[in-house]
């Protein structure tokens, strides 16, 4: 499958290029390379605070992979917030290799989850955060979108 199969939103804002590792119930490791078509570039730079979107996309892929194991399809998830967001460099450049490792801390049956994410730029820690996400069931999403 392609990354776009795991992230049910516009491919124009898909920032992840490949899945490196997926351990069900535990973690995901994904890779991206900053390119010139990246919609988040400003003056050729990807500002580090936008790394939160890359982390969130890694969790979207993780959730979609978990749903795939249960025979379900990918759905929208929501980034509720973050804590302990630390940035160790101000920006990333075109050509930089980004690897994100996200580990499940808490995931309950309602779809609420807490994940520890680390983002590495060319092998060095570039940012990290604790992300709170909601990945509700399909019925909840249908109802929310119809209102």
Protein language model annotation of sequence segments:
Residues 11-47:
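Catalytic strand-loop segment that frames the active site of acyl-thioester-processing enzymes
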Residues 17-20, 88, 103-105:
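Conserved positions in beta-strands of structured domains
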Residues 43-62, 76-77:
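Compact, glycine-rich, soluble single-domain proteins
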Residues 61-101:
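Hydrophobic beta-strand-centered segment that forms part of the acyl-chain substrate-binding groove
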Residues 1-10:
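Short aromatic-glycine motifs in intrinsically disordered, low-complexity regions
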Residues 14-17, 80, 100-102, 129:
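Small-residue-enriched segments and motifs
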Residues 61, 93-99, 103-147:
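HotDog/MaoC-like acyl-thioester-processing domains
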């Amino acid at each position: 499958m392609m990354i776009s199969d795991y992230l049910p939103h516009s491919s124009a804002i898909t920032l992840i290029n490949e899945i490196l590792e997926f351990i069900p119930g535990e973690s995901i490791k994904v890779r991206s390379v900053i390119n010139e078509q990246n919609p988040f570039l400003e003056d050729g730079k990807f500002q580090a605070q936008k790394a939160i979107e890359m982390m969130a996309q890694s969790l979207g892929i993780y959730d979609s992979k978990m749903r795939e194991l249960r025979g379900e399809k990918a759905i929208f998830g929501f980034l509720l917030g973050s804590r302990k967001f630390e940035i160790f460099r101000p920006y990333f450049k075109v050509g930089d290799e980004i690897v994100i490792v996200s580990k499940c801390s808490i995931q309950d049956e309602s779809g609420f989850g807490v994940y520890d994410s680390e983002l590495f730029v060319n092998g060095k820690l570039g940012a990290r955060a604790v992300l709170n996400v909601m990945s509700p069931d399909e019925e909840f999403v249908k109802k929310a979108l119809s209102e």
